[in-house]
Curated annotation (Swiss-Prot):
Belongs to the ABC transporter superfamily. Phosphate importer (TC 3.A.1.7) family. This is Phosphate import ATP-binding protein PstB. The gene is pstB. Part of the ABC transporter complex PstSACB involved in phosphate import. Responsible for energy coupling to the transport system. ATP binds at G43, P44, S45, G46, S47, G48, K49, S50. The complex is composed of two ATP-binding proteins (PstB), two transmembrane proteins (PstC and PstA) and a solute-binding protein (PstS).
Length: 257
């Protein structure tokens, strides 16, 4: 079983299998995601990284041909049961996608929208929450004088930080990021990476990335996946400097993938 013992576990994956129809996409995955740490999933395209990430908040639930078997324990509760409230799960486990996806509304309302689904706040309290989320996402100083402008008025990097602010505004416990920098320039990427490192003070962060250097810079633990299997899961420094499996070494040295 692949576990990291340096911190308490926030998510425990046990014998997880995932299917797209008859296609067996994830095969007997076992791993523990450490609380208030950054865990990165790396591997070539088609390895199952994003599929695994999306099981953590049941993004597949709208598609009846997709199914997960096994257990995913969030603080000890199996989220794969049919009794799991999807809305409450996604309030606990937020997600930021590959491309920035601001809502077609103001910067302020992008942040407030999700909060309104779960909380009834007075305007002053909502103003405070919006400022708090934008500050956490390192975006407040750039937006405080234009909160009522469209979210689309921001640059690509700012839009992605807006999406992160939107995700944390409802105060989740886990934040999932699926290739959050793939559409961004190097300067914006650097700011997002700094933000990811800061966010782990308050959240458990899981990131999917094709960029091995990004995983090495940002994460505490890294999982290498290949063809739906978890090949190796370790402390990030150990995985990149002294991998235990030849497949891992071949991938990080560019021999395949």
């Amino acid at each position: 079983m692949s576990m990291v013992e340096t911190a308490p576990s926030k998510i425990q994956v046990r014998d997880l299998n995932f299917y797209y129809g008859k296609f067996h996409a994830l095969k007997n995955i076992n791993l523990d995601i450490a609380k208030n740490q950054v865990t990165a999933f790396i591997g070539p395209s088609g390895s199952g990284k994003s599929t695994l990430l999306r099981t953590f908040n049941k993004m597949y639930s709208l598609y009846p041909e997709q199914r997960a078997e096994g257990e995913i324990l969030l603080d000890g509760d199996n989220i794969l049961t049919n009794t799991q409230d999807i809305a409450l799960l996604r309030a606990k486990v937020g997600m930021v996608f590959q491309k920035p996806t601001p809502f077609p509304m103001s910067i302020y309302d992008n942040i407030a929208f999700g909060v309104r689904l779960f909380e009834k706040l007075f305007r002053a309290d909502m103003d405070e929450r919006v400022q708090w989320a934008l500050t956490k996402a390192a975006l407040w100083n750039e937006t405080k004088d234009k909160l009522h402008q469209s979210g689309y008025s921001l640059s690509g990097g700012q839009q992605q930080r807006l999406c992160i602010a939107r995700g944390i505004a409802i105060r989740p416990e886990v934040l999932l990021l699926d290739e959050p920098c793939s559409a961004l320039d190097p300067i914006s990427t650097g700011r997002i990476e700094e933000l990811i490192t800061e966010l782990k003070q308050d959240y458990t962060v899981v990131i999917v990335t094709h960029n091995m250097q990004q995983a090495a810079r940002c994460s505490d633990h890294t999982a290498f996946m290949y063809l739906g299997e978890l090949i190796e899961f370790s402390n990030t420094d150990d995985l990149f400097t002294k991998p235990a499996k030849k497949q891992t070494e071949d991938y990080i040295t560019g021999r395949y993938g």
